[in-house]
């Protein structure tokens, strides 16, 4: 643990000079400017940030993530050279240029020499790389992450198979190539053109294809192509295979095509780079099987929308009569996720008007994973009997059947309850093998279900499009017990606790920045009322801008089915168009000054009113019709959806760009409040990120929009409303 804290401290030490010196440079630039130029320069800063983001995204296609620093150093060198022409000291151009060139070369050389990237020992790829015959077949640098295709004798298809190899006359998992993303294994690929698929007979996933032969199936995730081969082996009549990750698709259709083509060239198979939401919005034929691959959820962040309540509603509506949805859930560390998936399905079916939703669900499992089957029609005795026989032959366990249909009491895979003790004593182990998931499922889907959900240690609320966090079951009210059982928390839940820690840390630094003027002459030179308004105004801007950005990125991840594209598009659109708004805030007053001369005075608040009104209208539309419009537009092409998202972000960004420069123009130039305001804005922007994440997990992203309403309303009320003479805003000679 101490080693991890030391690593975090080293990251801070490495990043501190970059951001400290950048902030110092920008603050000094503001102090050197006249009021009318603040908007233009701040706009240039924002547009430059947007352009820089595009440069970094392009560099990610060619460089290892740790070496991206090499692309930044030339930009700093160029900024230093350009600063010479505004410097208040005299230096020969060749002296200054030589100094910059020397620092540039030393910095590039030091970065290339001292950066030694390696994977953490806890990453899945670390032991795989240490195998004697390990061979890296392919490396891919991408904004999506750092991909490696690994070949060694330990790599096998990661699939849940029965242990009854002899009885079923099958072999174990076939040899495969492992695909790792940032050190985590996310998929497998066949090693050759010929693959023995007999193992599929013992697979946990294959039951729907035995139940519905000659099915039209939708595969959400292909498991590197293996799922396609397995479905064809079990006589699927038509397959639509979806992959949301473009790099997986490129590997299948590129260097590994010789191993994959016998499956994907089959006329029954259609392979698309698409997420399930947009595809189902345009498909009208319906499916007999909708099958979610077990690794799909962990392959990309945007894939989390595949297990929301609304997604399950879409799957059910896309089923033909007698059709079935097959959903995976990992129970290796927690049985709780299986309960959450059942609760999500129950609420989805209730929302669709299905009476007795438990009659449409069956749950079966191995020792490590479970499958929830959701049927279009209530399960029949024949279908339930088929599942029981399937599980008995393979030593799998049935954890839930509707209508309390009797099943074998024998448990093949012991599954103890997930129990966290508030003290040091742990509950005694049961003397016989048990199925805690069966016991909990019966309570969850019974008449006592509401009491069971309310009293459960974990939060079983379904994930939704507004709260798309399937791996989020911790209750803040149980924080003390959570810390006592920290070693038992799955990796997927750690992000919630990290956000809590980062929020506390960022609040400390933000409050430190806030009190700085009160410790020096600036606090005594400026009226307390002015200081208070400055604190409120720029803190609100820092929080509000980031809340809008984070909300739009998440909306875009669902709408585009790709978080990387959504992040890039929203970030660039907001920076560029808020930069345009900032520039307009400086241009419009000077044109008004001409109209107002010689007698007039100009009030910046007169520009803030229309900007605030436009923002309020945008927020109202985002809280109201935006979600239905996004859902309606899912069937559009990806470029059309990108255009819509970019335009929607731009409509908010232009009025947002007015607030900061207009606020700076109201601060006394003889004080140090201008750099302090810049620091406040930056510090509370940092606070906004963990705070937004925690709010989204707890109450949903809509809460951020309501907070933005409040924050920008408060900022408007705290904006100084005293007139500024046009002479004060005159240009310096």
Per-range role (PLM):
Residues 1-163, 167-183, 188-205, 209-733:
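Alpha-helical transmembrane segments of multi-pass membrane proteins
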């Amino acid at each position: 643990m101490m080693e991890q804290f030391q690593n975090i401290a080293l990251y801070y030490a490495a990043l501190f000079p970059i951001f400290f010196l950048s902030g110092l440079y920008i603050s000094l630039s503001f102090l050197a400017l006249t009021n009318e130029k603040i908007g233009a320069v701040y706009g240039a800063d924002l547009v430059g940030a947007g352009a820089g983001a595009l440069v970094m995204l392009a560099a990610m296609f060619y460089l290892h993530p740790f070496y991206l620093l090499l692309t930044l150093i030339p930009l700093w060198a160029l900024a230093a050279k350009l600063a010479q022409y505004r410097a208040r000291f005299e230096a020969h151009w060749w002296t200054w240029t030589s100094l910059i060139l020397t620092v540039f070369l030393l910095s590039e050389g030091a970065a290339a020499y001292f950066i030694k990237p390696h994977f953490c020992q806890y990453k899945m790829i670390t032991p795989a790389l240490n195998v004697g015959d390990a061979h890296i077949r392919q490396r891919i640098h991408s904004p999506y992450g750092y991909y490696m295709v690994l070949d060694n004798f330990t790599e096998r298809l990661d699939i849940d198979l029965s242990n009854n190899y002899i009885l079923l006359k099958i072999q174990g998992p076939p040899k495969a190539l492992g695909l790792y993303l940032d050190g985590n294994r996310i998929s497998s690929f066949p090693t050759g053109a010929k693959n023995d698929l007999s193992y599929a007979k013992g697979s946990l996933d294959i039951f729907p294809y035995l139940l519905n032969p000659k099915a039209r199936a939708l595969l959400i995730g292909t498991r590197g192509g293996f799922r396609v081969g397995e479905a064809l082996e079990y006589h699927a009549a038509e397959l639509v295979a979806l992959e949301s990750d473009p790099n997986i698709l490129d590997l299948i259709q590129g260097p590994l095509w010789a191993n994959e083509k016998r499956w994907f060239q089959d006329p029954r198979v259609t392979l698309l780079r698409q997420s399930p939401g947009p595809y189902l919005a345009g498909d009208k034929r319906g499916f007999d099987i909708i099958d979610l691959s077990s690794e799909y959820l962990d392959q990309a962040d945007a894939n989390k929308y595949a297990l929301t309540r609304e997604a399950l509603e879409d799957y059910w509506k896309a089923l033909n009569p007698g059709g079935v949805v097959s959903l995976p859930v990992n129970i290796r560390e927690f049985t709780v996720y299986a309960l959450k998936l059942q609760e999500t399905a129950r609420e989805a079916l209730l929302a669709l008007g299905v009476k007795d939703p438990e009659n449409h669900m069956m749950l079966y499992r191995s020792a490590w994973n479970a499958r929830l089957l959701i049927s279009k029609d209530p399960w029949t005795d024949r279908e339930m009997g088929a599942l029981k026989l399937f599980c008995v032959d393979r030593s799998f366990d049935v954890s839930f059947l509707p209508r309390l249909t009797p099943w074998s009491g024998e448990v093949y895979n012991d599954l103890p309850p997930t129990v966290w003790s508030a003290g040091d004593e742990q509950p005694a182990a049961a003397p016989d093998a048990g199925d805690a998931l069966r016991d909990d499922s019966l309570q969850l889907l019974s008449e006592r279900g509401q009491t069971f959900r309310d009293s459960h240690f974990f939060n079983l609320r379904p994930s939704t499009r507004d709260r798309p966090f399937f791996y989020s079951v911790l209750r803040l009210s149980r924080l003390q017990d959570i810390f006592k059982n920290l070693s038992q928390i799955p990796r997927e839940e750690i992000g919630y606790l990290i956000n809590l820690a980062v929020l506390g840390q960022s609040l400390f630094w933000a409050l430190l920045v806030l009190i700085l003027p009160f410790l020096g002459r600036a606090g005594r030179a400026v009226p307390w009322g002015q200081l208070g308004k400055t604190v409120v105004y720029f803190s609100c801007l820092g929080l509000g801008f980031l809340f809008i950005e984070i909300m739009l990125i998440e909306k875009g991840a669902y709408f585009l089915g790709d978080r990387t594209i959504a992040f890039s598009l929203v970030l660039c659109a907001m920076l560029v168009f808020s930069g345009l708004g900032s520039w307009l805030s400086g241009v419009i007053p000077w044109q008004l000054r001409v109209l107002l001369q010689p007698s007039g005075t100009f009030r910046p608040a007169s520009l803030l009113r229309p900007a605030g009104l436009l923002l309020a209208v945008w927020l109202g539309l985002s809280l109201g019709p935006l979600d239905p419009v996004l859902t309606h537009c899912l069937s559009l092409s990806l470029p059309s959806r990108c255009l819509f998202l970019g335009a929607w972000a731009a409509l908010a960004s232009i009025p947002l760009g007015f607030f900061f420069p207009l606020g700076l123009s109201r601060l006394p130039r003889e004080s140090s409040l201008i750099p302090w305001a810049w620091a406040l804005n930056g510090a509370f922007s940092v606070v906004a990120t963990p705070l937004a994440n925690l709010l989204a997990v707890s109450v949903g992203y809509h809460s951020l929009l309501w907070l933005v309403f409040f924050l920008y309303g408060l900022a408007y009320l705290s904006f100084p409303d005293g007139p500024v003479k046009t002479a004060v805003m005159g240009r310096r000679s």
